Regions:
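Hydrophobic membrane-insertion alpha-helices, especially the h-region
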Residues: 2-15
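Eukaryote-biased recognition of intrinsically disordered, low-complexity regulatory segments
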Residues: 12-31
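Short, contiguous acidic and Ser/Thr-rich linear segments
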Residues: 27-41
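LysM (lysin motif) carbohydrate-binding repeats in extracellular/periplasmic proteins that recognize
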Residues: 37-77
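Solvent-exposed coil/turn segments that connect beta secondary-structure elements
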Residues: 79, 102-104, 185, 211, ...
């Protein structure tokens, strides 16, 4: 009888210990909880104490699902529990809990590595244009959201370094200096111009058309043999901004090839027809062009205003470092031939030394020597914008 009573007492004690209620602090509020209560059940019965899951966000930062993010955060005795740990936890004496809102989550996404091409910045107002800073490509990671269909750039993108085109008017020291230049040849007028230059012991720069060089190779060779500078006016005098990339590069490089074949000189110097060489053209062909040479004094000799008018235009407008534009081809150039002695003699009377464009650039000293030497080369780590 006594043994039976003792057994009942022991069972009652075990039952009391195992199923008794204990105080459990939750978010600073003390609640009575039966020992062994599943934590997951306890949280659900109390609606997670007002805490809510985080939002599910798109890669672009828009809300896809207000409750589709990370679940409510549950911390026991300073340690955050995982979802599996919450499901496996039975509440016990001495536990302390904190329940808070879940954090936002980003939708599933795929990643794409993208190259960022450099842009072109072009200085204005100068007669000589050249690559002052080579561009370098950047890169970024693009996220493609699987639910939203949105795309967004990930953090940590490396920006591109822009290509910078310098543009300066030449200001040589020790002058005054001036460069005489001729476009659109060689032609039947070129020998007369060369003879005048030789007679007066001066050198000029000839911006030749590649197709004219191909059909007048002896005249092109005579330019170089006379100690003059030969450069390119492109192959066929097209408006370069209207050309697609491959056509543009061909228009430039074919002229270089024809000049080299006729004279042995591989130039990188051009004068774009109409002076039109924009950021777009530099971005497409800056690796094959050393410099684009414009002018400071336009004689308008192609309008045939008379030899004296052509000469007066030069003498009334020339300054130290000026580049003078004339033509030895592209039409009737008799007035240019007639004006040339007047120009040379007038410049000499005013103390000017007549040099080539390359010499003028070198005397100025601000443009890299590789430009003068037709040795410009794009660095291996550089990139063109297009």
């Amino acid at each position: 009888m006594l043994a039976g009573i003792l057994a009942v007492v022991v069972l009652a004690g075990v039952w009391f210990v195992a199923l008794r209620s204990v105080p459990v602090p939750v978010n600073g509020q003390e609640l009575s909880v039966r020992i062994g209560t599943p934590l997951e059940t306890f949280l659900a019965d109390n609606d997670y104490f007002g805490a809510t899951p985080g939002r599910l966000m798109s890669v672009g930062g828009n809300v896809i699902d207000e409750r589709g993010g990370n679940p409510c955060a549950v911390v026991r005795d300073g340690q955050e529990l995982t979802t599996d740990e919450i499901a496996a936890t039975a509440m016990g004496d001495g536990d302390t809990y904190t329940v808070s809102n879940g954090t936002d989550a980003v939708e599933p996404y795929t990643e794409e590595e993208v190259t960022i091409p450099p842009a072109v910045q072009k200085e204005r107002g100068g007669a000589v244009q050249y690559v002052k800073q080579w561009g370098q490509a950047g890169h970024k990671t693009v996220l493609h959201g699987e639910r939203s269909g949105e795309t967004a750039d990930a953090e940590g993108a490396v920006p591109a370094t822009d290509m910078i085109i310098g543009s300066i008017n030449l200001k040589p020291e020790g002058g005054p200096y001036v460069a005489l230049t001729f476009d659109d040849g060689p032609s039947r007028y070129t020998p007369d111009i060369l003879a005048i230059l030789a007679d007066r012991g001066v050198h000029a720069t000839f911006f030749c058309l590649g197709n004219q060089v191909a059909s007048n190779q002896s005249e092109a060779k005579a330019i170089v043999d006379g100690g003059h500078e030969i450069a390119s006016h492109t192959q066929s005098h097209q408006n370069l901004p209207t050309l697609e990339r491959d056509s543009l590069r061909s228009e430039i490089s074919t002229a270089f090839d024809n000049i080299e074949q006729a004279t042995g000189v591989r130039t990188q110097m051009i004068r774009a027809p109409y002076g039109a060489f924009t950021e777009q053209e530099w971005g497409r062909a800056g690796d094959i062009v050393g410099c684009n040479v414009l002018w400071n004094v336009d004689t308008h000799d192609w309008e045939r205003p008379g030899a004296q008018a052509i000469a007066d235009t030069v003498l009334n407008n020339v300054r130290n470092g000026s580049i003078v534009l004339m033509h030895d081809g592209g039409g009737n150039r008799e007035q240019t031939v007639e004006a040339l002695p007047l120009i040379i003699d007038g410049l000499h009377d005013r103390g000017y030394q007549i040099v080539t464009v390359g010499e003028l650039i070198e005397l100025d000293g601000r443009i890299p020597q590789a430009v003068v030497g037709n040795a410009v080369s794009m660095p291996e780590d550089a990139a063109l914008p297009a």
